[in-house]
């Protein structure tokens, strides 16, 4: 898997993991703010273009969570997730 970086300094959202062709799915890595142990979760997004800018990707990501009644600040701040995921590094 290749890595697609998001620069979100000071937030718990850390890394976006992409499929090789960067066209269908991304995996979001979260750091749980209530524990020292690193937790990795994911949410599946559909990417329609192969060359998205990080800012645009984040906006799309926010919209997807808002559709399910979640706010990005709530999600990132409290570690709320829609579904869990495996650790891509394992």
Swiss-Prot record:
GO terms for cellular component: cytoplasm; nucleus. The lineage of its organism: Eukaryota, Fungi, Dikarya, Ascomycota, Saccharomycotina. This is Uncharacterized protein YOL159C-A. The keyword Cytoplasm applies. Keywords: Cytoplasm. Present with 125 molecules/cell in log phase SD medium. It is found in: Cytoplasm.
